[in-house]
Amino acid sequence: MSERLPVLLQYLVPQRALTVFAGFVASGRWGGITTAIIRRFVRKYRVDMSEAAEPDIARYTRFNDFFTRALRPGARPLASAELVCPVDGAISQFGAIERDQIFQAKGHHYSTRALVGGDAELAARFQDGQFATLYLSPRDYHRIHMPCDGRLLRMIHVPGDLFSVNPVTARGVPGLFARNERVVCEFDGPLGPFVLVLVGATIVGSMATVWHGQVNPPRSGRLREWRYADRELRLRQGEEMGRFLLGSTVVALFPQGSVRFDPGWEPGRAVRLGEAMAFAPLL
């Protein structure tokens, strides 16, 4: 019962109205009020500001500027691995995709096709492949970086719900990551095609990518797609590719037989940007 009540409340709260209001507050310049909000947030979630490029809270004029703060140079060195962790956060789940089914939590799976917005051809590339679901808590650094070199092929904005994506909700809401609003980014990399899915959540005001800027809002209620195959848009391993304006989850997809996850990985473990995530398969 302890977990059922907060999940039930997720169905009752006006998710979109709450998210729009949070976005309005976070993007506004409210002077001393903004500073007070940030200061309280830092205390509540024990945010380590010594890692930030700008550690002085008073220098942030908007909450969003604080939330998407850059790290100081050298704060996240890259491991020597084919795939490095793209975010600071925690491992929600990872492992094999069983045919087209991705494990969310005990008793809950969702399909790769649903996750990528219904594109059967794209989903088929990851049948029996590998996935990693990474949760970013409020205290974490909220920029997303490239796990490896990649050439951008396509971006899809998939409209959806705005449930919270914390571990309790992941255990209680069926198909959570395939029903929330999300941005699907398709790349070609050294180990083959891969996808990074930025999943929205309650009070996630917007998601942005470095090549497009803010993707949402607007929220048109329909699927939107951008193609980049003819633009030779390439990003290097460790380079920023996007950010959450208020936190969420990233789901990464890799083809069958293309990666071996680091043996130290396990669900619930804290991870940091740049640490080893996976390696090329053994020959």
Swiss-Prot record:
Site feature Cleavage (non-hydrolytic), where: G247, S248
Topology of this chain in the membrane: Peripheral membrane protein
Note describing how the cofactor binds: Binds 1 pyruvoyl group covalently per subunit.
Pathway: Phospholipid metabolism; phosphatidylethanolamine biosynthesis; phosphatidylethanolamine from CDP-diacylglycerol: step 2/2
Coiled coil spans: none
A single GO molecular function term of this UniProt record: phosphatidylserine decarboxylase activity
GO cellular component terms, semicolon-separated: plasma membrane
Its job: Catalyzes the formation of phosphatidylethanolamine (PtdEtn) from phosphatidylserine (PtdSer).
HAMAP family registered for this protein in UniProt: PS_decarb_PSD_B_type1 (MF_00662)
Assigned protein family: Belongs to the phosphatidylserine decarboxylase family. PSD-B subfamily. Prokaryotic type I sub-subfamily.
Protein's name according to its UniProt entry: Phosphatidylserine decarboxylase proenzyme
Native source species: Methylibium petroleiphilum (strain ATCC BAA-1232 / LMG 22953 / PM1)
Gene that specifies this protein: psd
